C-alpha cells in the first residue's frame, strides 16, 4: 500500500479519495490547503492525519509517496513541478496545463526523477475501453463520429446572478474547452490520431470564458465532430457511424452506456454505467501499477504520457484558433 496526499477539496477529490481507498492500494495520509481551517476540516472528513498550508513542506513530507492534484487549472504547473522536484509521484486532474511546452517539461522532469506523472482522465483507464475499441473495429468503415459532452454547469446560476465562479473565470485557465472539450479530444486522438485539419467555433461569455464550442476534425476517411458546453444539457449520445453498424455511447467521459446498433435494427448493450468513485478507482489502480510495476507497465505508461502531450498540443492550437487566450500564454 502507498500513502498519498491531496491538493483540492472539491467533489472530484472526494470521489478520487473514495475510489483510491476502495482499491485497497492507497492510504490517505495528508491534505494540502492554503486555508488551515478548511484543510483541517477536509482531513477530518476523510481521515487524513496530516494537514499542510505550505506547499514546500507538503512536498517534502516523507510520509507521502504520491499526490493527487485537483486545484484550479492555472495552479497545476507550479504545484506539479514542486511535487516532482521533491520526489513525489503525481496524478493531476485534466487538463494538465494550458500550454503543451509545460506538459513536456513536467513529463521530462518526471522521467529524470524516475517518477510517474499522470493525467487523471477517466476515459483512458476504464476496462470497458477495450470493449469500445473492439466494437469500433467491428462496424466497418467509419465515416462519421460525433463526440459530445454538454453538461449544464452547477455554477451557471451563480454566474447569471452576477458572481464569477472559478469555472467561468479565464484567469484560472478554465472554460468549456478546458473543462469538457478535453473529454471529447481524448477519444478522438486515442482512436484515430491527430486530424489533418480542424475548424472550431465557440460561444464566448461576458467573463471572457468560452461557454460552449463545436470542433470539426477532418481525417482522410472520416469527420469527427466535438460538441461541448457548460451552458446546457445534452439529450443525445455520442456515436461512431460505420458501414456495418453504429456504436452509441451515453457518456463519453465515463464510457458509460455503450450500445452496439446493428444494421438489422437490433441493439446490443456492451456496458452499463458505474458509480463515479469506481471510475476514478481505475485511475488510482493504474497509477499504483505504473509506480510499483514500472517495467511491466512501461509501454502503457509511455503511451499515456505521449497522449497527454498530443492532447495538450491540439487543445492549445484550438484555443488560439478560437481566440481563447490566457495570461500564461504571454510567458511562452
Give residue ranges: language-model regions.
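Active-site loop of classical SDR/Rossmann-like NAD(P)-dependent oxidoreductases
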Residues: 273-285
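N-terminal Rossmann-like dinucleotide-binding module
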Residues: 1-46, 324-331
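Contiguous beta-strand/loop segments that form the cofactor/metal-binding neighborhood of enzyme cores
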Residues: 184-255, 285-295, 331
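Hydrophobic residues in well-ordered beta-strands that form the structural core
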Residues: 13, 52, 92, 117-119, ...
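Rossmann-fold dehydrogenase core element
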Residues: 104-123, 143-144
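Beta-loop-alpha module in the N-terminal Rossmann-like domain of NAD(P)-dependent dehydrogenases
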Residues: 46-109
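C-terminal helix-rich "cap/oligomerization" subdomain common to oxidoreductases
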Residues: 66-68, 286-332
Amino acid at each position: 500500500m502507498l500513502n498519498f496526499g491531496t491538493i483540492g477539496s472539491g467533489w472530484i477529490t472526494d470521489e478520487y479519495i473514495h475510489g483510491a481507498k476502495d482499491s485497497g492500494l492507497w492510504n490517505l495520509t495528508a491534505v494540502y490547503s492554503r486555508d488551515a481551517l478548511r484543510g483541517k476540516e477536509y482531513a477530518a472528513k476523510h481521515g487524513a492525519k496530516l494537514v499542510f498550508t505550505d506547499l514546500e513542506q507538503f512536498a517534502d513530507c516523507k510520509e507521502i509517496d504520491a499526490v493527487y492534484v485537483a486545484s484550479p487549472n492555472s495552479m497545476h504547473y507550479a504545484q506539479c513541478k514542486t511535487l516532482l522536484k521533491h520526489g513525489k509521484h503525481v496524478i493531476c486532474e485534466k487538463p494538465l496545463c494550458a500550454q503543451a511546452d509545460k506538459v513536456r517539461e513536467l513529463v521530462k522532469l518526471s522521467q529524470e526523477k524516475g517518477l510517474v506523472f499522470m493525467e487523471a482522465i477517466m476515459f483512458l483507464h476504464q476496462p470497458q475501453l477495450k470493449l469500445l475499441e473492439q466494437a469500433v473495429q467491428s462496424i466497418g468503415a467509419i465515416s462519421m463520429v460525433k463526440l459530445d459532452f454538454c453538461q449544464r454547469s452547477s455554477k451557471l446560476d451563480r454566474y447569471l446572478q452576477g458572481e464569477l465562479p472559478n469555472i467561468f473565470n479565464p484567469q484560472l485557465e478554465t472554460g468549456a474547452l478546458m473543462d469538457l472539450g478535453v473529454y471529447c479530444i481524448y477519444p478522438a486522438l486515442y482512436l484515430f490520431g491527430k486530424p489533418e485539419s480542424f475548424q472550431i467555433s465557440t460561444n464566448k461569455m461576458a467573463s471572457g470564458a468560452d461557454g460552449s464550442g463545436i470542433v470539426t476534425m477532418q481525417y482522410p476517411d472520416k469527420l469527427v465532430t466535438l460538441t461541448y458546453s457548460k451552458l446546457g444539457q445534452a439529450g443525445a449520445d455520442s456515436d461512431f457511424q460505420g458501414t456495418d453498424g453504429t456504436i452509441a455511447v451515453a457518456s463519453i467521459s465515463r464510457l458509460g452506456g455503450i450500445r452496439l446498433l446493428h444494421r438489422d435494427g437490433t441493439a446490443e448493450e456492451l456496458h452499463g454505467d458505474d458509480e463515479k468513485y469506481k471510475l476514478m478507482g481505475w485511475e488510482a489502480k493504474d497509477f499504483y501499477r505504473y509506480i510499483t510495476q514500472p517495467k511491466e507497465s512501461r509501454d502503457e505508461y509511455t503511451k499515456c504520457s505521449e497522449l497527454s502531450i498530443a492532447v495538450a498540443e491540439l487543445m492549445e492550437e484550438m484555443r488560439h484558433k478560437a481566440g481563447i487566450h490566457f495570461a500564461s500564454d504571454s510567458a511562452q
